[in-house]
Structure formats: C-alpha cells, structure tokens
Amino acid sequence: MNYRIDNLQYCNWSREIFEINREAGLDAIHVTVVYHEDYDEFLNRVKEWDELFNKNNDLIFLGKSYEDITKAQKENKTAVFFGFQNCSPIEDDINLVEKVHQFGCRFMQLTYNNQSLLATGCYEKNDSGVTNFGREVIKEMNRVGIVIDMSHSAEQSTLDAIDLSEKPIAITHANPSFWHEAKRNKSNTVLKKLAESGGILGLSLYAHHLKDSTNCKLDSFCEMVARTVDIMGSKKVGKGSYLCQNKPDS
C-alpha cells in the first residue's frame, strides 16, 4: 500500500490548512509541537491540539502508530504525528521520555542547532557528538517508541546517533550538502550511513535549505532528488516540506 506523508510541517494551524492537506491527499503529517518549550509548556500545546482535533475530527486525528496511517487513508483523513524540534520538554529527567510518549510524541530531535544536554547542533563550532546523557536518552526513546530525529544536528552527533540507536533514525527535513552547502544540510557520508541503517531522509522545501533560496528552480530540485535517490535508494527518501503556512516570513 502506498501512502502520502509529509515528514515535517510547522504551520499556524487552522481548518483551512487541514483542508489543504486533505486536498493534497496526505495520509499523515509530522507536526512540530515544540521548539524550545519545557514539559509543562508541552502539555499546554497538547491541550491546544486536543481542541483542534475536536473541532476538525472530520479531517484529522492524533496518529500514534503505523496502523493509524492506514486508518487515515481508509477514512479519508490525515493522521497527525507529534514531534519535537528540541529535547527541551524532557528537561534533564530521562523519566519524561516515557511521559511525552504517553501524550503523543513520536519524534524528537536531540538538539535544535545549538548544543543541548544530548548532542551538538549544526551551528556549533565544535561537535563533541552525542553526550553520555544522550546515549541513555536514545536507549529510552528506542524502548518507548520515539523516533530519533537529527535534522538540526551536527555531523558527528548525527553519525553517533545512527550508530547508537537500535532502531532506524530519521532526518525529517533537510537536503544534501552536495546540492547546497547550508549548515543544516547533510553530507554524503551521513546520507549513505542513514540509508544503510534503514533510516529515512525527508527533503525540505524551506528556502534556507534550497540552492538559490527562493529562486530555486524546479528542475534543479528534481535533479537533486534523483541524485539523492541514487545515493540512498528510493525507499529511503521522502518529503519533509517544512511547510510554514500562515507564519510570518521572519
């Protein structure tokens, strides 16, 4: 069975956007519910999403497993999977990994651009890799069922996460650095190791990740997709649009 999945969206959520996703035939979307929020603030985001689910239950529902993607396709709805762009909601307490999973989190980045308690972000000058605490958190994420996302992480930290995780990881929204040398984009070394480990890459439409930014040409993007598939294989490459509808340009 084939599914249409967007591996990352970050929008100012409304019924209009959910309708657009349905018109696009998306069976599932991974949404950012946390950037830098702590645990209590994450719970507030959950309450906000509960209201969205209740008001738009003909279009969306909370996704928690692969089976929910099949369910969404059959019911002509979109399954919404919660993800964190940072590890801030678990604070410095490994027990919160299971707690956030219970409230629907299914993806968590180990860091967002900068150094965290778990790993090094892509904007740091020195990449010390996954920390000791990060190693323990990876084990716990594997245990409870949260996908490790290294989209905003530095090279060595990303390679460490691939090696340390007993389950495939994801880079949900980034592009290859061979196409555009943004700090957020990933090297061929990472792409190959990600694919070999069973992980997946979601290609991004975000301007800062694109060659020529907002002037990026469709042909150029498609050529990049084809070359990435040559490196990783067609089953390891998806889309992580980083759609930011109704958000300010800044």
Question: Could you tell me what each predicted segment is?
Answer:
Residues 1-127, 181-239, 243-250:
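N-terminal hydrophobic targeting/anchoring segments and the immediately downstream early-domain regions
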Residues 89-91, 102-185:
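Divalent metal-binding pocket/active-site signature
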